[in-house]
């Protein structure tokens, strides 16, 4: 049975090459029949497929089951193979729904039938559309849990790499035999702009491979578009949309302060010119065109693009905004039958990122998704010039654009206005915050050979194998070498006294800058939005004194380093292989190498906040007793087929204003909380990743 799961994984290989070719480094051939051939290969496809099969190097042949009923895909086939795909476009959403429906409808455990259906879809559909729908189906079917989702950056490297790289990569693949180690292609750190553009100071963060993979993978686990409501309607999905993006904005603002920039300015006047320009320096290998740039001073314009299913005006958007603001002000939403329902944070999230879960899409619109579309089509709002969308409309590239953060700063402000309205959310009472009998006596961070309460960051170069995405080039690994931020591993040391009997407690760890842009102490009303959650975990407390230690690499926020920079094809004997197989669901976690903000060479003052909360108020009764498929990254990603593993509101205790404390010192005075000044210090050196393949 293992072979069939390997066969499914081969459908990710070289998405632009036809299926008549061999797949994978081992040259595996799918034996096609006439029903799988597209019109351009109708005359000679079987002959070519057989010719590949006669090659001595073919290691294995996969015989496909003929389908009794061939899927039609009337909508999805309308997307040309060389077009780019975006979930923000209504017409593309309909196409994706159609394909996902077909792949999900194959009878469970009929894996040969499913494989043939997927091969047919792979051959007949746009490669980006297929990859998205295929991955969503693989993640959500119960019989494909052993199929490993492949690293998107390895399959579509053009979404992550300077376009100049691919000429060098193909030359290396063609000239240097795969048996000889190939010198990695160096990706310069400053390839999209210079520091004359102040926003470019954040390019290392916005264009980080792991951060962009996180965003792409999160939206695979939590798709907003699917006909089957079960795929969308996961536990607390709307609230998680709020919290994950709120933490992205908080982390981005932390990085801005480290780079002497103000916090990001929300985009609230939708008719003003946009000063932020962005030139992505990316080419789409699917469409063989460059991604459209955005010049400084451009504005939103009414969208009239029938080909994309877009017909929406700025007036429409402003009306939707007023309706959402009214729902927040009254605490109620109006349903399609004119009745009302009490608004909560989960419902608001499903209104902002409109999906089948939106309570009234006609009234509240699709604001978040349309904000991406308006921002992506400023250069061609009427399809007059046949231009495609900008990077902000692709889940894998959207976080590269500085304007993404202005859009999401406004989105977060809407959620914060809900949290700050007492008729919607009441401030926490003392009993909701305290943990009777538990006293935190000290908190600290320690790293091997380093100063106590100092976190150390540095630059690292890591390699990614591009060969799976280099269509029509010779086989063998071709590596691109990225420079990215990293930090020295550290651990938290928390000392606590428990005057009651043995019990469990949830440890919640946050950090935030100690001062604002003007180097002044924060008001809690502002600093609470700057706290970034570093870890959350449950531990037993024995009676009396306790010392809790936790390694930074154990964080429930992050995915291991290997899941961002990994090549599954060489992991066969790796003892981590069982962990890597869990990438399908947990892969949407925050990248471990970006856990700590950059800091500065001189050191930036931060505050470490630790809370030991009352586990009796935290715990969740899961619907069944099945073992978890993975434990990492549950903070942003939840748990597969289970409830979110924390009963508290996401972001607790900083998700809402305090009715008594005005600063963090006052707020953290409760016995079950601890506060410690720490420093984040950057060592401005670049080190090679010891995991890189030998050159």
UniProtKB/Swiss-Prot annotation:
GO terms for molecular function: chloride ion binding; copper ion binding; tyrosinase activity. Cu cation B binds at residues 368, 372, 408. One of its GO terms (biological process) is melanin biosynthetic process from tyrosine. It catalyses: 2 L-dopa + O2 = 2 L-dopaquinone + 2 H2O; L-tyrosine + O2 = L-dopaquinone + H2O. Keywords: Copper, Disulfide bond, Melanin biosynthesis, Metal-binding, Monooxygenase, Oxidoreductase, Secreted. Synthesized by oenocytoids, a type of hemocyte, and released into the hemolymph plasma. One of its GO terms (cellular component) is extracellular region. The N-terminus is blocked. It holds the Pfam family Hemocyanin_M. The active site is at residue 353. InterPro entries: Di-copper_centre_dom_sf (IPR008922), Hemocyanin/hexamerin (IPR013788), Hemocyanin/hexamerin_mid_dom (IPR000896), Hemocyanin_C (IPR005203), Hemocyanin_C_sf (IPR037020), Hemocyanin_N (IPR005204), Hemocyanin_N_sf (IPR036697), Ig_E-set (IPR014756). Activated by immulectin and lipopolysaccharide. It is an enzyme of class 1 (oxidoreductase). Heterodimer. Forms a complex with an interleukin 1-like protein as a consequence of a host defense response. This is a copper-containing oxidase that functions in the formation of pigments such as melanins and other polyphenolic compounds. Catalyzes the rate-limiting conversions of tyrosine to DOPA, DOPA to DOPA-quinone and possibly 5,6 dihydroxyindole to indole-5'6 quinone. Binds to the surface of hemocytes and is involved in hemocyte melanization. This is Phenoloxidase subunit 2. It comes from Manduca sexta.
């Amino acid at each position: 049975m293992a072979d069939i799961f390997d066969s499914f994984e081969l459908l990710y290989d070289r998405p632009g090459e036809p299926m008549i070719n061999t797949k994978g480094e081992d040259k595996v051939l799918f034996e096609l029949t006439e029903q799988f051939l597209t019109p351009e290969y109708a005359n000679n496809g079987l002959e070519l497929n057989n010719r590949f099969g006669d090659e001595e190097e073919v290691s294995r042949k996969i015989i496909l089951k003929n389908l009794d009923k061939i899927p039609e895909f009337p909508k999805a086939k309308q997307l040309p193979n060389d077009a780019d795909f975006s979930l923000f476009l209504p017409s593309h959403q309909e196409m994706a729904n159609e394909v996902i429906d077909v792949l999900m409808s194959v009878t469970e455990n009929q894996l040969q039938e499913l494989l043939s259906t997927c091969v047919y879809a792979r051959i007949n559909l746009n490669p980006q559309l297929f990859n998205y729908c295929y991955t969503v189906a693989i993640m959500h079917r119960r019989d494909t849990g052993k199929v490993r989702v492949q690293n998107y950056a390895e399959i579509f490297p053009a979404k992550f790499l300077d376009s100049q790289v691919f000429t060098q990569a193909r030359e290396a693949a063609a000239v240097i035999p795969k048996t000889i180690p190939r010198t990695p292609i160096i990706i310069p750190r400053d390839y999209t702009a210079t520091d004359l553009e102040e926003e470019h100071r954040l390019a290392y963060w916005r264009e980080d491979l792991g951060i962009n993979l996180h965003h792409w993978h999160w939206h695979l686990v939590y798709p907003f578009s699917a006909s089957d409501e079960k795929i969308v309607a996961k536990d607390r999905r709307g609230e998680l949309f709020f919290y994950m993006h709120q933490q992205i904005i908080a982390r981005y603002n932390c990085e801005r302060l480290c780079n002497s920039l103000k916090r990001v300015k929300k985009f609230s006047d939708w008719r003003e010119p946009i000063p932020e320009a962005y030139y992505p320096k990316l080419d789409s290998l699917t469409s063989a065109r460059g991604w459209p740039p955005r010049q400084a001073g451009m504005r939103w314009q009414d969208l009239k693009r029938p080909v994309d299913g877009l017909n929406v005006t700025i007036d429409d958007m402003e009306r939707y905004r007023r309706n959402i603001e009214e729902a927040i002000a009254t605490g109620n939403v109006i349903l399609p039958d004119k009745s009302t329902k009490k608004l909560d944070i989960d419902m608001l999230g499903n209104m902002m990122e409109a999906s089948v879960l939106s309570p009234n899409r006609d009234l509240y619109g699709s604001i978040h998704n349309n904000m991406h579309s308006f921002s992506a089509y400023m250069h061609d709002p009427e399809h007059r010039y046949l231009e495609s969308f900008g990077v902000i409309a692709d889940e894998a590239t959207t976080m590269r654009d500085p304007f993404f953060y202005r859009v999401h700063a406004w989105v977060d402000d809407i959620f914060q206005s809900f949290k700050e309205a007492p008729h919607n959310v009441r401030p926490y009472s003392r009993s909701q915050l305290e943990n009777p009998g538990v006293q935190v006596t000290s908190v600290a961070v320690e790293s091997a050979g380093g100063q106590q309460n100092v976190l150390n960051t540095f630059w690292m170069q890591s390699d990614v194998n591009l060969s799976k995405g280099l269509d029509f080039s010779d086989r063998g690994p071709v590596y691109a070498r990225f420079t990215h931020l990293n930090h020295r591993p550290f651990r938290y040391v928390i000392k606590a006294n428990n005057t009651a009997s043995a019990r469990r407690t949830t440890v919640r760890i946050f950090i935030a800058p100690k001062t604002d842009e003007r180097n002044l102490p924060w008001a809690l009303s502002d600093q609470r939005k700057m706290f970034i959650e570093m870890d959350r975990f449950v531990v037993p407390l024995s009676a009396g004194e306790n010392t809790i230690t936790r390694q930074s690499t154990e964080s429930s926020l992050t995915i291991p380093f290997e899941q961002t920079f990994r090549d599954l094809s060489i992991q066969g004997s790796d003892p981590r292989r069982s962990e890597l197989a869990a990438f399908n669901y947990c892969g949407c976690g925050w990248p471990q190498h970006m856990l700590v903000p950059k800091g500065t060479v001189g050191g930036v003052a931060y505050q470490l906040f630790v809370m030991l909360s009352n586990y009796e108020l935290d715990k969740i009764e899961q619907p069944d007793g099945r073992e978890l498929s993975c434990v990492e990254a549950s903070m942003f990603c939840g748990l597969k087929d289970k409830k979110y593993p924390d009963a508290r509101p996401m972001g607790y205790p900083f998700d809402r204003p305090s009715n008594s404390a005005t600063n963090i010192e006052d707020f953290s005075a409760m016995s079950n909380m601890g506060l410690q000044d720490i420093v984040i210090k950057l060592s401005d050196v670049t080190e090679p990743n010891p995991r890189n393949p030998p050159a």
